[in-house]
Each structure stands twice: as structure tokens, then as C-alpha cells.
């Protein structure tokens, strides 16, 4: 019996695993292959179904904002239309697209786009191609990025918007004209509004941007005397204030534009994302924002007062160490025998980050404040601030949490590791006019990360392997610790 379930003739995306193999209910068929029945894994039982409800006009309660689910719904509907046009299927596109491929493919697009965005963000923070290449490569070959981009959960969507917003924000900070500064600031507001409409954690990204703008102003004008009326006037009207704002904008104009970008636009986008709730009658137009506000309160109460536990829950301080990853899927019945080893086949999918990337990023994150202060390094300061604002908000939360809540912080763990590696790569020994020694360290580090990715690939994709190869401890299988099972 074969030990891989890939069927090139199956659903579109089969070979890259979008629809298959991680579906519940593997069973050997008489033809000695594996049948891929439809099925949800982990929180797909909520988000994929809620997305389908959005298409069908069915009311539901979910404590997360609606935009990410609407994007999943767009994927389901589009795939349903594809089946009608290219397969000759008959029926409602919403129902025809309600398949694993339908609710997963949109996330895969957004997840894939995060990779070049990380390259662009890194290059904008520090115009060093080694830094940018390392950031994109580490993103591409991390297990959490890989998994969350391939399943019907909502987390990849806010991550995409957050990375894009940070990129636009840094483009804005480096603007040279008032026009470019205004355009990029407003675009940043639009994207951060989309991020908040996908998940509330994006509010932390917005807070970090506002903090950076405030620090820029304070640092630039800390020497101004503001204790007198004349000093206050100088803060608001002096020509000396112009350069403090990106693009040379005057401070009063810039503050007004920032209020529009960071308050008005996100509020409008967030409110607009709830229009489907009004359209299907779950909210009533006659009540104005009353139903929406009540829903927000219920969502907050859910997060604040949830007391349920979960066997794969983990405390926030354990996440960087990969103490307790989440098993999204596991199957050990009816998969057959591995022809090479004679072991029973098992299949699983664990939300485990790439250990090489995660563990080596920890000292890099710790080093960032030192580099920021010693070298007055904006990239180091920005990455450190981004990590803290995406990670620490989880600390006071008492409800059950999971490793994937580290997703936002992972952006900056990757950037921290890439930044330190790129710093080490600078000034290497030149041979034939080319610097080799230190860049070799960076390339070797990335190569090991790729090897780790290849090794753990089966437990990120649900490909059946021998049980010892899966469950064996360190040096034997992929589940190195009992807490990983």
C-alpha cells in the first residue's frame, strides 16, 4: 500500500495540500489509495461554517470581527462559481464551494503574499538585501506561517494586513513630499482598518504606530521651551516644526490628517464590515448602532469571562519556546502499513513552529533593545516595539490561549533573527573581492531552517508516515517532547 495520499486528479490544489490530505476520515480504498472525504479541522468547524452562513444570510454569533470570515466566504463562493463554469456543476455557488478547498484557498493566497511583504518591509526598515532575503526565507519556511496559510482559520488575514500596514507606515515615515506623506498615511489607515476588522489584535499595531509618531515629535522638539505661551505657539506654528512630520508637513495639518487616517478611516471600515449583519436582519437598521454595540459588548464579555479549558491551551510566556503546540488533526486508524519500515501509518497536523527559527530568534529578540540603544538603530527599535505590542497584550488575558496567538509576535521574531543574522553577515572576510565568511553564516542558518522544514513537513501537512517517525521522541520521530503530542 502506498504511503502517500496525493491524488493529482483530485480537487484543484491537491498537490499543494490545500484540499488534501489533512481531512478527517482517511480510509484505504480497494484500489489501494486513500479517499479524501470532506471535513473540518480544529476551528474550521466555526470559521468555515460562519463564512458559509454569511453567504446564506444565516445569523450567528462569533466573538471575532467579520472581515476575515467574509474573505473565507469569498473563497467559498468563488470556488463554487469555478465549479459551475469549469465542471458543469449545478446549484448554489455558496453550497458548491463549501468544501475544504473552498474555505482554504483564500487564506493560502494571503499567506503567500506575506512572504514578499516581509521582504519589502525588511528592505524598508534597513536597505540591506541579506536582511530582506533572510526575513522572507524564514517566513516561507516556518511551520506556523505554513499551516495557518493553508487552513480555514482567520489568523492569516489580520497578519497580512498588519505586515502591509507596517510596510506602508514605514514608507510614510520616509516620504519626501507632503503629497506622498499624505497618501501613504491615508493608505496606512485603510489597511490598519482592514486589519482591525479582521481581528482586534491589530489595535496593538495601531498603538505602536501612534507611539512611534509621538516619540518622533518628542525627540525632535524636546529642547523647545513649552512652559510659556510663546513656547506653546512655537509648537503649533513655528517653521521649525515642519521637518518633524514626514514629507515636511506642518504639524497642525499632519495631526489633523493623522486623526483621519488612524481614527476616522478605521472606524468607518470597521463599521462597514458589519453591514452583512444588517442586510440579513441580525442587526436592525432602525436601531442604528445599538445592535452593533451590544454585539461588541457580548464579544468582549466572551473573551473576558471565558472559563473553558482545553488540553492544548498554553500560557503566553511559554509560546516562544514551543512548549505546547496545537494538534489540529490526528488519524491512526485504517491508514495501512508503511511499505519501507513496516510501521503502521499515522497522519497528523500540528501547529508547530519551525524549532530552528523560533528558538534561535529568542536571543535575537532579547538583544534588540541593546542594539537599539547602543547603535541608535531604528530597525532594532522598531522590531522590538512591534514584538512587545503584539506579544504582551496577551499577558493579562485569563481565558484559555493557544500557541497560534503568538502569530503576530512571530512576525517580529522572524525580523529579529533576520536582522541579527544580517548584522553578523556584514563585514565578512573578502576573497576575490567578495565577502564570504560572515555571509556564509547567514546562508548556513537559512539552509538549516529549510532542512528543519523538510523534516517536519509531514506533521505540518498530514502526510501519513510510520508511527515511530511521527510519535518517536528526539532523534527518532518528529514529536520530540510529550507536550508536542
Predicted regions mapped to residue ranges:
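Transmembrane helical bundles and short interhelical boundary loops of multi-pass, membrane-embedded
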Residues: 5, 10-11, 22, 26, ...
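Transmembrane-helix motifs of polytopic, lipid-linked glycan transferases
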Residues: 93, 101, 105-126, 164-168, ...
Amino acid at each position: 500500500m502506498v504511503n502517500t495520499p496525493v491524488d493529482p486528479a483530485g480537487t484543484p490544489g491537491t498537490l499543494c495540500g490545500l484540499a488534501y490530505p489533512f481531512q478527517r476520515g482517511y480510509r484505504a480504498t480497494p484500489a489501494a489509495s486513500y479517499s479524501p472525504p470532506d471535513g473540518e479541522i480544529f476551528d474550521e468547524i466555526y470559521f468555515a461554517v460562519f463564512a458559509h452562513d454569511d453567504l446564506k444570510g444565516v445569523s450567528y454569533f462569533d466573538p471575532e470581527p467579520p472581515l476575515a470570515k467574509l474573505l473565507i466566504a469569498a473563497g467559498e463562493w468563488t470556488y463554487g462559481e469555478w465549479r459551475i463554469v469549469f465542471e458543469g456543476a449545478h446549484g448554489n455557488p455558496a453550497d458548491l464551494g463549501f468544501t475544504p478547498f473552498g474555505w482554504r484557498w483564500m487564506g493560502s493566497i494571503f499567506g503567500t503574499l506575506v512572504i514578499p511583504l516581509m521582504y519589502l518591509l525588511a528592505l524598508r526598515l534597513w536597505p540591506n538585501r541579506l536582511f530582506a532575503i533572510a526575513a522572507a526565507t524564514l517566513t516561507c519556511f516556518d511551520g506556523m506561517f505554513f499551516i495557518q496559510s493553508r487552513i480555514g482559520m482567520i489568523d492569516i488575514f489580520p497578519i497580512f494586513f498588519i505586515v502591509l500596514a507596517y510596510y506602508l507606515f514605514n514608507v510614510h515615515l520616509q516620504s519626501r513630499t507632503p503629497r506622498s506623506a499624505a497618501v501613504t498615511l491615508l493608505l496606512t489607515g485603510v489597511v490598519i482598518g482592514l486589519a482591525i476588522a479582521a481581528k482586534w489584535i491589530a489595535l496593538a499595531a495601531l498603538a505602536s504606530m501612534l507611539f512611534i509618531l509621538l516619540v518622533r515629535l518628542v525627540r525632535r522638539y524636546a529642547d523647545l521651551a513649552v512652559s510659556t505661551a510663546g513656547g506653546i505657539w512655537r509648537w503649533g506654528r513655528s517653521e521649525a516644526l515642519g521637518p518633524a512630520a514626514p514629507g515636511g508637513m506642518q504639524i497642525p495639518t499632519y495631526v489633523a490628517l493623522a486623526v483621519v487616517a488612524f481614527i476616522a478611516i478605521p472606524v468607518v471600515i470597521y463599521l462597514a464590515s458589519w453591514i452583512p449583519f444588517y442586510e440579513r436582519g441580525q442587526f436592525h437598521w432602525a436601531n442604528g448602532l445599538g445592535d452593533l454595540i451590544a454585539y461588541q459588548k457580548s464579544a468582549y464579555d466572551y473573551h473576558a469571562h471565558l472559563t473553558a479549558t482545553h488540553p492544548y491551551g498554553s500560557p503566553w510566556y511559554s509560546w516562544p519556546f514551543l512548549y505546547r503546540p496545537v494538534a489540529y488533526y490526528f488519524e491512526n486508524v485504517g491508514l495501512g502499513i508503511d511499505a519501507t519500515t513496516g510501521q503502521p501509518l499515522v497522519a497528523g497536523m500540528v501547529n508547530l513552529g519551525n524549532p530552528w527559527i523560533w528558538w534561535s530568534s529568542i536571543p535575537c529578540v532579547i538583544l534588540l533593545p541593546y542594539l537599539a540603544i547602543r547603535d541608535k538603530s531604528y530597525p532594532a527599535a522598531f522590531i522590538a516595539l512591534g514584538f512587545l505590542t503584539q506579544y504582551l497584550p496577551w499577558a493579562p488575558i485569563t481565558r484559555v490561549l493557544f500557541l497560534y496567538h503568538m502569530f503576530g509576535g512571530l512576525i517580529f521574531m522572524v525580523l529579529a533573527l533576520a536582522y541579527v543574522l544580517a548584522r553578523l553577515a556584514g563585514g565578512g572576510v573578502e576573497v576575490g573581492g567578495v565577502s564570504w565568511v560572515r555571509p556564509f553564516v547567514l546562508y548556513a542558518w537559512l539552509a538549516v531552517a529549510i532542512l528543519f522544514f523538510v523534516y517536519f513537513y509531514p506533521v505540518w501537512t498530514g502526510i501519513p508516515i510510520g508511527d515511530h517517525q511521527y510519535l518517536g521522541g528526539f532523534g527518532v520521530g518528529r514529536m520530540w517532547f510529550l507536550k508536542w503530542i
